[in-house]
Amino acid sequence: MRVLAAMSGGVDSAVAAARAVDAGHDVTGVHLALSRSPESDRTGARGCCTIEDARDARRAADILGIPFYVWDLADRFETDVIEEFVESYAAGRTPNPCVRCNERIKFAAVLDKALALGFEAVVTGHHARLDPDGTLRRSVDPDKDQSYVLGTLRPEQLAAARFPLGDSTKAQVRVEAAERRLAVADKPDSHDICFISHGDTGGWLRERLGPRPGPVIDATTGQTLGHHDGAYAFTVGQRRGLKLGRPAADGRPRYVLDISPVTSTVTVGPAEALDVRRLVADRAVWPHEGAVSCLAQVRAHGGVVPAVAQARDEELVVTLTTPVRGTAAGQAVVLYDGDRVLGGGHIRTTGG
């Protein structure tokens, strides 16, 4: 099979490409240039698609003896991931850019181009498993499982995907990389949002959106507890950095409950007010009929809770048997039957 291996410059994608070669496939490596920021060209820079990442990917391809190319998808990434990220925060939502990148870049822009060039599949270093029938499952490594950020992919996207690492732990991948003499064997994992390398999401958004001051209101008393420079810098469930000028009347900690972009108002309240028992998701991938008992996951590294999911018109309604705390519109909800992904969508509204 002629396959395209997406090589980020990290250890996972390098070993995934190596395993594709071992499986007898005709493999070509490609590194995605997703940023035109001058910072990404600086030696030692961190973040999205730095020059060092491209070099690491090329070195790995050379060791594997496969052709290697760099594809410039910066404009597409800006439009489909970064702009959507900014617009979501400006609208009071909390997006997951990794989910969006998989939906629109790796398994849309890259996959479409790969198929047009005659490749039959795209290989990535995601920690997830795919059955021959296209069923997506969790990785055997629960700490590194990435099925959540893949859980909103459509069946036709999964049909052309290959995840060679799903049956291995991250420790095993690193050992294998060292045995193959890949220089990235000990390269640290990336944890930040890739295009916000310094980790200050609020500051990065402020540069894009400018100051939009407003009040911080207590939901219990209606009192103004403080002021902020931009509601977009907050997320539902946040406790730290609320800029409260006075304590709440009951003396208890306060958490962000709601964000109103129209009035630039941030509403805070006690922790129990964050409990969510019902989610409505759109842009859903849900091929099931009727009410389905399942397990729901609403964060990339969160746990699961029992739920019942049912399609309603173009929406997916998820009722949680056990409430989850601090779930925000914009996040993904992915639904499981054991380790099997049933489908998912993007949370539009939540309810207590």
From Swiss-Prot:
Top-level taxon: Bacteria
Secretion signal, residue range per the UniProt entry: none
Annotated positions for site Interaction with tRNA: 126, 331
Gene Ontology cellular component terms for the protein in this record: cytoplasm
Disulfide pairings: 101-194
Function: Catalyzes the 2-thiolation of uridine at the wobble position (U34) of tRNA, leading to the formation of s(2)U34.
EC code: 2.8.1.13
Catalytic activity, reaction form: S-sulfanyl-L-cysteinyl-[protein] + uridine(34) in tRNA + AH2 + ATP = 2-thiouridine(34) in tRNA + L-cysteinyl-[protein] + A + AMP + diphosphate + H(+)
Sequence positions that bind ATP: 6-13, 32, 125
PANTHER family per UniProt: MITOCHONDRIAL TRNA-SPECIFIC 2-THIOURIDYLASE 1 (PTHR11933:SF5), TRNA 5-METHYLAMINOMETHYL-2-THIOURIDYLATE -METHYLTRANSFERASE (PTHR11933)
Biological process per Gene Ontology, one example term: tRNA wobble position uridine thiolation
Protein name as it appears in the record: tRNA-specific 2-thiouridylase MnmA
Compartment(s) of residence: Cytoplasm
Lineage: Bacteria, Bacillati, Actinomycetota, Actinomycetes, Frankiales
CDD domains in UniProt: MnmA_TRMU-like
Matches recorded under HAMAP family: tRNA_thiouridyl_MnmA (MF_00144)
Active site: 101 (nucleophile), 194 (cysteine persulfide intermediate)
Family classification: Belongs to the MnmA/TRMU family.
Family matches, as Gene3D superfamilies: Adenine nucleotide alpha hydrolases-like domains, HUPs, Translation factors
GO MF annotations in UniProt: ATP binding; tRNA binding; tRNA-uridine 2-sulfurtransferase activity
Top-level enzyme category: transferase
Predominant subcellular localization, coarse grouping: cytoplasm
Keyword ATP-binding: yes
Region (Interaction with tRNA): 144-146
Annotated keywords: ATP-binding, Cytoplasm, Disulfide bond, Nucleotide-binding, RNA-binding, Transferase, tRNA processing, tRNA-binding
